[in-house]
């Protein structure tokens, strides 16, 4: 009988880190949503989860400093690496020409910088 792995990740259900966990862990898993990177680490340190999934680096925006800080401040260490493709969507009513301002997470805005600049959209980090 195999033991179900519990994996903590930062974000809501459907987050890229949850998707990475589901894609890369074999067998049945349970994913646990956390509101901060620190909480992700605390879940694994406190044995609520077996593993933590943290975004460490992005090919466009570089390192994710908050993840490094959380990991460095813990007793945990990296045991693997996952490459996970990120694809963003701009969703709304109307056409692209109707859009004036895009509100999103700073990482997402940075990852979509070329697209946003091509359309001259204003951006607001949230």
Predicted segments, located by residue:
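Domain-level signature for soluble enzymes in the chorismate/prephenate branch of the shikimate pathway
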Residues: 1-126
């Amino acid at each position: 009988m195999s033991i179900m792995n519990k994996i903590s990740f930062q974000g809501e259900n459907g987050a890229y880190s949850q998707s990475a966990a589901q894609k890369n862990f074999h067998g049945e898993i349970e994913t646990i949503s956390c509101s901060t990177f620190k909480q992700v680490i605390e879940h694994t340190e406190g044995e609520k989860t077996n593993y933590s999934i943290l975004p460490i680096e992005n090919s466009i925006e570089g390192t994710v400093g908050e993840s490094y800080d959380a990991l460095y401040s813990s007793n945990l260490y990296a045991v693997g690496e996952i490459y996970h493709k990120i694809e963003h969507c701009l969703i709304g009513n109307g056409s692209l020409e109707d859009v004036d301002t895009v509100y999103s997470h700073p990482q997402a805005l940075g990852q979509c910088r070329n697209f946003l600049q091509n359309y001259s959209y204003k951006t607001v980090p949230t």
